[in-house]
Design a protein with these regions (language model features):
Chain A
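Short hydrophobic/Thr-rich beta-strand motif most characteristic of the beta2 strand and flanking loop
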Residues: 26-33, 41
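The feature encodes the CheY-like receiver
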Residues: 15, 57, 75, 87
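Active-site beta3 strand of CheY-like receiver
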Residues: 45-51, 56
């Protein structure tokens, strides 16, 4: 078992594809599709790595990440951010919010897998 | 030689797909089941009549069995693999496309779709930041594209995928593509409604070109004694933007002056005698050759059945007027071929150049060009004149000794002449054979 990934994303078929890829590579994948209580879900699950979409219903991925980074228990959690906007402004915002890595949609499956592996040192 | 050795696999694939038993196919093709088994496992070569018989029983073209999927499909699959960066077995792409033609085609279609969508998404990213409705639609499209892209990549990967998952992914792609179609349709409707005005017909120069082309470069309103630019403006400039109306009015005013100086009934007789030769006509009419060139471009078909082409550029080389000929196309945007006599005329203002020209890839006698640069506007005191060049292109006249035509092109991007000192950018065409 490579570890637990928590995927917070609201697009069901993206969830399905990422879940398939990561599960096949040996990861235990949990998913969540709502921004409002996302931070609580992260705390409850305490995953090894978090994949976080920026545009979530209810609450933005940036806000969720800022809240987590303020919590000492999650200050070092590896976070891969997904966004549908590639502008440097978004990358900057993600970095400032504390993302470990930033990925633009549409992404290559292999890149997601590589990023997850690299961020967890697996 | 995968192409050669896979015929058996394709026979088996096809047979299983249409639910024919091996023994039945063997019997109907007049061979033993064990021999067919060897063929299907690519251990015996097959060709000739037996191949035709088996193809007939399986109801496919024999080439589908021998050659498998088309070269275009294979090429697309290769590109897909290289773009998506997976670990696809490129050496077995033939086999994949041959054995799963439906899946292979689906994959190719998905890629085509992804490419198109990615392109439109790229084009629109700029607007994304400014328009909330656009931002929402584009986010939706990107999400859907991402889902399709990921799912298609999984299907494209080598190795077994559980059939249940395969079905599920197939269904997801189907759903997402339907959603994508819906979103893009909505987006197009929105954008069309949004861009109803200024951006519709491109630059003012393009609007002018379109308006003049629509009237055949001939304006009857200006050919009569009391002809008025206003009447012509009303007909031609109705739908034009304000800037284009300005350009059009300038052009029509010049047309009116040319028509007053060289009315049709005056031009008719020397034209019958000399043809559209601007030098001879300028002599016969005692007129400015530049004006004669412009006038020739405006003549109606009953006076000049074979039309002439005309290009006018300003001192920067920018085309300000273009009337192309079928044998002498002119670029709609950007710079024209630097070899055009039009530009050489700017090197030697006041000298009338007259020479045959030939576009690449065209045979026959070619065309004849006259080019002349003259000052535009009034002569300024102690200041440089602003030159303008004109080039008339006309059918090759009958001359006793034809010089070698000067090779010219349309524009570098669409020109096959590789060894050209004037080339400014690479050609998108393959080099001329």
């Amino acid at each position: 078992m490579a570890g637990q990934v928590l995927l917070i994303e609201d697009e069901p078929n993206i969830i399905e594809a990422i879940k398939f890829i990561l599960s096949r590579a040996g990861w235990d994948v949990a998913t969540h599709s709502n921004g409002v209580d996302a931070a609580e879900v992260v705390r409850a699950r305490a995953p090894d790595i978090l994949i976080l979409d920026v545009m979530l219903p209810g609450r933005s991925g940036y806000d969720i990440l800022r809240e987590l980074r303020d919590d000492p228990g999650f200050a070092d959690l590896p976070v891969l951010m997904l966004t549908a906007r590639g502008q440097s402004k978004d990358r900057e915002m993600a970095e400032r919010a504390g993302a470990s890595r930033f990925m633009t949609k549409p992404f290559a499956n292999a890149d997601v897998l590589d990023a997850v592996r690299a961020l967890t040192g697996a | 030689m995968p192409r050669d050795t896979l015929t058996g696999s394709r026979i088996r694939e096809r047979r299983v797909a249409i639910g024919v038993k091996q023994a039945d196919l063997a019997r109907r093709a007049g061979i033993s089941a064990s021999y067919l088994n060897l063929i299907e496992h690519n251990r015996r070569r097959i060709g000739g009549k037996l191949l035709l018989d088996i193809a007939a029983v399986l109801d496919v073209e024999p080439t589908m069995l021998t050659e498998g999927a088309g070269a275009a499909l294979i090429a697309t699959l290769r590109e897909t693999a290289s773009e998506l960066g997976g670990a696809a077995e490129l050496d077995r792409v033939d086999e994949f496309a041959g054995r799963f033609p439906g899946w292979a085609q689906l994959l190719a279609d998905c890629r085509a779709r992804i490419v198109t969508l990615e392109r439109s998404v790229e084009t629109l990213t700029d607007r994304m930041t400014h328009d909330p409705h656009l931002a929402a639609s584009l986010h939706e499209m990107l999400s859907t594209v991402t889902a399709i892209h990921s799912t298609a990549s999984i299907l494209a990967e080598p190795g077994e995928i559980d059939p249940d998952w395969q079905t599920r992914f197939h269904r997801n792609i189907h759903e997402d593509s339907a959603r994508l179609a819906e979103t893009s349709r909505g987006l197009v409707t929105y954008l069309e409604a949004d861009e109803a005005d200024a951006t519709r017909t491109g630059t003012p120069q393009e609007e002018l070109d379109a308006a003049l082309e629509a009237t055949g470069h001939h304006v009857p309103e200006l050919e009569t004694a009391g002809g008025s630019v206003d009447a012509a403006m009303e007909r031609l400039g109705q739908d034009a933007s304000l800037s284009a109306q300005g350009l059009l009015r300038d052009w029509l005013t010049r047309y009116a002056a040319d028509a007053r100086a060289l009315p049709l009934d005056l031009v008719e007789t020397p034209l019958r005698r000399h043809g559209p030769d601007p030098v001879a006509l300028a002599h016969a009419l005692d007129a400015d050759p530049a004006r004669v060139m412009r006038r020739l471009a405006t003549l109606p078909p009953d006076l000049l059945p074979e039309p002439v082409g005309l290009a006018i550029c300003d001192a920067s080389g920018t085309l300000r007027y273009r009337k192309p000929l079928p044998d002498f196309p002119m670029p709609r945007f950007g710079a024209a071929c630097p070899l055009w006599p039009l530009y050489h005329a700017l090197n030697r203002p006041g000298v009338l150049l007259s020479l045959p020209v030939q576009q690449p890839g065209r045979t026959g006698p070619g065309l004849w060009a006259e080019a002349l640069a003259v000052p535009r506007g009034r002569i300024a005191v102690n200041d440089e004149a602003i030159y303008e060049a004109q080039m008339l292109v006309r059918p090759h006249p009958l001359v006793s000794e034809t010089p070698v035509p000067r090779p010219v092109g349309v524009a570098c991007r669409v020109c096959p002449r590789e060894a050209c000192a004037a080339r400014s950018e690479p050609s998108i065409l393959a080099p001329a054979g």
